Curated annotation (Swiss-Prot):
Annotated organism of origin: Sulfurimonas denitrificans (strain ATCC 33889 / DSM 1251)
Function comment: Catalyzes the hydrolysis of N-succinyl-L,L-diaminopimelic acid (SDAP), forming succinate and LL-2,6-diaminopimelate (DAP), an intermediate involved in the bacterial biosynthesis of lysine and meso-diaminopimelic acid, an essential component of bacterial cell walls.
Pathway: Amino-acid biosynthesis; L-lysine biosynthesis via DAP pathway; LL-2,6-diaminopimelate from (S)-tetrahydrodipicolinate (succinylase route): step 3/3
Gene this protein is translated from: dapE
Protein name as it appears in the record: Succinyl-diaminopimelate desuccinylase
Pfam families (UniProt xref): M20_dimer (PF07687), Peptidase_M20 (PF01546)
Amino acid sequence: MKTIELFKFMISAKSQTPDDGGLLDFIQNYLDDFEAIRVDVEGVKNLFLYKKFSQGDHLCFAGHVDVVPAGDGWDSDPYIATERDGYIYGRGAQDMKSGVAAFVQAIKDTKHFNGTLSLLLTSDEEGEGTYGTIEVLNYLRDKSMLPDFAVVAEPTCEMVFGDAIKVGRRGSINGYITLRGKQGHAAYPEKSINPINLIAPKLANMAGVDLDNGDEFFSPSKFVITDIRAGMQVTNVTPNELKMMFNVRNTTLTSQKEIREFVEKNLEDLDYDLRLTQGSYPFKTDTKTKLVKNIDASIEQISGIKPKHSTAGGTSDARHMAPLGIDVIEFGVINDTIHAINERTTKDEVKKLYEVFKHLIDTWK
């Protein structure tokens, strides 16, 4: 089986999160000369394969086989790899069955490596992610088996293949504000305390405000209001309280402390509660490490392009690796149709991705 054939086969597996569509069993059998560890938790399937070729570094390729729901409106069956107009269409074509197929085949074709090669796959990345990659990493940590370096094959390229790798990600902090007032009749506003009136003049100083200036790798942390609601959906009663939710994709320059201080500064004269939760923490891999230098060289060798180092976009499972001391980057195909109707990629991109990963493995030292 070659890369494109493997890629098409993977698309045909209906692996809507957290279902793996049988892919983890298939891949385990496909790489039957690798040692296998299964860490299946609460219905989530996780697979770790490893093989020590020689003394040296431990390099891991990681990803997920689950996909988001396909939805309606596709021009072809989202679970049949369909070639049309120079593209291969199917759910997961970009995110991220192309990446998984590329590194699985690259590993399959490897006879020699300067160290240990491994593969980490989960069926729970697009969903909650609670019992996915993090469970495998915790197991490996307890067994002193964590990799030194990791490549997550998420789709990272923006305009052309090879133009970007992720060397980090912003964190994500969610905020929940409850602002208290005093309910009353709309005809007698002087007898009530309307929380809508209280918050209205404050919003201009909060919505969309940059909380830091960012740096050469991170765009500024921005205060993004995502929901405001109050009242009982009637016209003659003013609300007793208002609830507001917000999100901050934070850099390493902004933490919960700075966000709390920002809210307190703007709402200091109001009666409110604030709750913050950390969805993920920001991280950045040193761009001078062996991993970044080697992947840059492999991408440039195959694509002729020197990739930029980016931290843009949402979160990925790489966020679980960095805090454990693993040098991690992300690299994959163009990401312009991820989670979209008629998701697609090209044969050329998938083949080149395989070649990049194979070159990285073959030249690692």
